[in-house]
Regions:
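Glycine-rich flavin
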Residues: 2-4, 20-26, 31-163
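Glycine-rich Rossmann-fold phosphate-binding loop(s) that bind the pyrophosphate
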Residues: 9-13, 33-34
Length: 163
């Protein structure tokens, strides 16, 4: 069984904890089943701002006449917007993972962690333990309890940014 000083589950804000621990010379395991950067980089803050920017541009074209500008609105290619989001943000997560794989005192596990006791996790059939464990994982969109919402086709941020 691999043993570390610090074990961090979650590569969103948890990656900052893991990097700081490794920089302090502590042998650190960082476990993330998805791309590094967590919700903010991959499914929340950053991609939503890019989608909002596309919507803002579309709205400017639709309202151009108000400003005595001739422009024709031909629609939004949402798939192309999402392609741009992925093309912009995926390299950031991939670059982060590449840097972490080269970082002294840091081991990156790209799989799901399942706790077997309070200081040990199983990752793809391998057990890993540590003296200190940080759990910084599990963010998911909140679907508010709005009457009738279950009767309509709604999207969460994860749904909207997926194909």
């Amino acid at each position: 069984m691999a043993r570390y000083d610090v074990l961090v589950v979650g590569g969103g804000t948890g990656n900052n904890v893991a990097a700081a621990a490794a920089d302090a010379g502590l042998d650190t395991a960082l476990i993330e089943k998805g791309p590094l950067g967590g919700t903010c980089l991959n499914r929340g803050c950053n991609p939503s701002k890019m989608v909002i920017q596309a919507a803002t541009a579309a709205n400017h074209v639709r309202e151009a006449e108000r400003f005595h500008v001739e422009a024709a609105f031909g629609g939004v290619d949402f798939a192309a917007v999402i392609d741009d989001v992925e093309a912009t943000l995926s390299p950031i997560a991939e670059g982060m993972a590449a840097r972490y794989r080269e970082k002294d005192h840091l081991t990156l596990y790209s799989d799901e962690a399942v706790f077997v006791d309070e200081r040990t996790v199983e990752i793809g059939g391998e057990r890993v333990s540590a003296d200190r464990v940080v759990v910084a994982a599990g963010s998911r969109p909140l679907v508010p309890p709005i009457e009738g919402l279950d009767e309509v086709d709604y999207l969460t941020s994860t749904d909207a940014l997926s194909r």
